[in-house]
Amino acid sequence: MFPMVTGFMNYGQQTVRAARYIGQSFMITLSHANRLPVTIQYPYEKSITSERFRGRIHFEFDKCIACEVCVRVCPIDLPVVDWRLETDIRKKRLLNYSIDFGICIFCGNCVEYCPTNCLSMTEEYELSTYDRHELNYNQIALGRLPMSVIGDYTVRTIMNSTQIKISMDKSLDSRTITN
């Protein structure tokens, strides 16, 4: 009879422990129910990108001196620079510049090390196409600036969590009274 009582006590303890675990997990689930949804309705709502966001590369043909620093610092030797040496003025003349964004890893080394600042990162991240050959941008396509998300009236922009914290900090700072 004694082992039977011990078995019932163990069963009761295990039942209470299981009920406590279920109750704890249910409380966690209920605490998450009060939070706002994290997802956004993508085509109609877009979040504003951060200040140092690395999107599509913008290229200014007139500033480029064909030094090929961008090719040397690229971890995958991606930019294709075609140039011709002008013997009468002893300078390189840029003929063609292209980047294949299907291969690009958006590291930003080319932008950082460019001596003439002819390369810059834009906020454009929508580069999807049905054909991967359309991702090979020449100097004309690289020179086009993307349309700003903020200026588009059909798209509602949503600030991400870091931008909300920054704006809240600024509003708190503006309310402080200094003598």
Swiss-Prot record:
EC number in record: 7.1.1.-
Details of cofactor binding: Binds 2 [4Fe-4S] clusters per subunit.
Keywords (A to Z) from UniProt: 4Fe-4S, Chloroplast, Iron, Iron-sulfur, Membrane, Metal-binding, NAD, NADP, Plastid, Plastoquinone, Quinone, Repeat, Thylakoid, Translocase
Residue ranges occupied by any 4Fe-4S ferredoxin-type domain in the UniProt entry: 55-84, 95-124
Residue numbers binding [4Fe-4S] cluster 2: 74, 104, 107, 110
Reaction catalysed by this enzyme: a plastoquinone + NADH + (n+1) H(+)(in) = a plastoquinol + NAD(+) + n H(+)(out); a plastoquinone + NADPH + (n+1) H(+)(in) = a plastoquinol + NADP(+) + n H(+)(out)
Keyword Membrane recorded: yes
A cellular component annotation (GO) from this entry: chloroplast thylakoid membrane
Subcellular location: Plastid, Chloroplast thylakoid membrane
Summary of subunit composition and partner proteins: NDH is composed of at least 16 different subunits, 5 of which are encoded in the nucleus.
NCBIfam families from the UniProt entry: ndhI (TIGR00403), NuoI (TIGR01971), PRK05888.1-3 (NF004537)
Protein name: NAD(P)H-quinone oxidoreductase subunit I, chloroplastic
Organism encoding this protein: Nuphar advena (Common spatterdock)
